[in-house]
Amino acid sequence: MLHRHIRAFVILLSTLAVGPLSLVPEPRAQTAASSAELRISGAVTTPLVLTASDLKKMPRKTLSVVNPHEKKTEVYEGVLLEELLRKAGVPQGEKMRGPAMTTYVVAEAEDGYRVVFSLAELDLGIVDSEVIVADTMDGAPLAAKQGPFRLVAPHEKRPARWVRMLKSITVVRASVQ
């Protein structure tokens, strides 16, 4: 009996020290988007640190895609990844030959999830598939669990390379021996 009272007292003290847990979610999505940064680095001539505001000022692309996980059509808007790589000085178009063809891109999420694309897969002079860094879905900023940035590759049968909470893009030149 005394043990139960001590336990209740400890819980009460913990609540007073930490404060009651709120059932109302904090407005994280809005502040996360305004302070979030997307880093583009590695084998680039101009490393970039881009904010949501920076992306809004760039040429925009809208893609209507069927999300296989959700089994519904979603409309994403953002910037072509090819455009961001161009801005960072990554070889594209006619310069995509020789060593540039062994270059790959690693996209990483906040939780450490990583995916790889060959640079050629992202060059619209070579392929017809567009990959975007989205910041809105269905006309609204991405939800906290999705954004503030999300890589969307609609041409893929499985969305395994649709990176949620995208934080960085690293360009790597493969060493061929």
Label the predicted regions:
Residues 1-5:
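N-terminal secretory signal peptides that target proteins for export/translocation
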Residues 28-177:
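N-terminal intrinsically disordered, low-complexity segments enriched in P/E/S/T
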